[in-house]
Amino acid sequence: TLLNVHGIDQITAAIKIVFASLYNDRAIAYRVHQKFPHDKVSLSAGIQKMVRSDLGASGVMFTLDTESGFRDAIFITAAYGLGETIVQGTVNPDEFYVYKRGLTLGYPAILSRRLGTKAIEMVYGDKKSTNDTFTLTRNVDVERRMRFSLSDTQVEALARQAMIIEQHYGHPMDIEWALDGLDKQLY
């Protein structure tokens, strides 16, 4: 994932980086281990407008409890800034468990919430960082760290979307999401 890419020159360079990733050590080792022919692999590069989660929050949600496999709960993680810190495991996020049936019936459905330390956040940067993106990681001030990064209303809205996505695909899902800090919408 290459974030905060601007203009045709940066987009062209980013696409080249994505295509070159087909031939990095990890990709080659994976194909060898899976006995997948190198000449049969395909790759595409998706380009989309950046959600301004650097001014909001982001995270990952699972349509089951990842520890127990319990399928009647949705597990949501959330932290400030771009989602890469959660995906990479470099931040201790807030965690929420939502009961699907309670949500469906219109009851308060948040089973538990745990305040993460959220010590760092990834935001847009002006210069290319070491991971080929225009981002930087910075400390989160103590006042923000002591607050949940999502309201209960936002947690339940995410959980509703997770249930719709799971129903569409017919099996448990792992879903990345973002809260735009400008328009306050969940994506």
Residue ranges and their predicted role:
Residues T1-Y187:
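Nucleotide/phosphate-binding sheet-loop regions of phosphoryl- and nucleotidyl-transfer enzymes
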